[in-house]
C-alpha cells in the first residue's frame, strides 16, 4: 500500500509525495503555501482517483514521466522512469492503492542540517 507524505520545504512552502509500499517516490506535488492545501489535494485524490488524467511524456534524457492532472491543472509530477512499463506500473500503483493509503505529516520535524 502506498503512503502520502506531507513535508515542509526549505523555503517554508509545503509539498506532498506519494510513495510506493517499498518507499520509492512515485510523484511529488508542486509547492503549496499552506499545509491544508496539501491535505485538501490528498483527500481529493483519495476520493476521486479515477477522475485524474495521467499525461505521459519523455524527458530530454530519454526517461519517462507523467503529470497527474485534473481540469488542466497539474496536481503532481512523477519521478523519472527508465521504461514505459515501469511508468505504467507507477500509475497503476496510484490507482490501486491511493484510496486506502495512509497520510504521514512530517511538517513539524526540524531540518537535520539547518543553514
Protein language model features and the residues they cover:
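Short aromatic-glycine-(Arg/Gly/Cys) micro-motifs in beta-strand/loop hairpins
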Residues: 3-26, 57-75
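A short, exposed loop/beta-hairpin motif centered on an aromatic-Gly-Thr core
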Residues: 23-34, 73-83
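A low-complexity, Ser/Thr/Gly/Pro-enriched, surface-exposed linker/loop concept
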Residues: 25, 32-54, 93-104
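Short, solvent-exposed interaction modules
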Residues: 44-96
Amino acid at each position: 500500500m502506498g503512503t502520502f507524505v506531507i513535508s515542509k520545504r526549505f523555503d517554508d512552502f509545503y509539498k506532498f509525495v506519494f510513495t510506493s509500499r517499498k518507499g520509492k517516490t512515485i510523484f511529488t506535488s508542486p509547492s503549496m503555501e499552506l499545509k491544508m492545501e496539501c491535505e485538501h489535494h490528498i483527500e481529493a485524490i483519495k476520493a476521486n482517483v479515477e477522475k485524474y488524467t495521467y499525461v505521459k511524456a519523455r524527458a530530454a534524457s530519454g526517461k519517462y514521466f507523467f503529470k497527474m492532472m485534473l481540469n488542466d491543472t497539474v496536481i503532481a509530477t512523477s519521478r523519472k522512469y527508465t521504461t514505459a512499463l515501469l511508468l505504467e506500473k507507477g500509475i497503476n500503483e496510484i490507482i490501486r492503492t491511493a484510496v486506502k493509503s495512509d497520510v504521514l505529516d512530517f511538517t513539524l520535524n526540524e531540518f537535520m542540517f539547518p543553514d
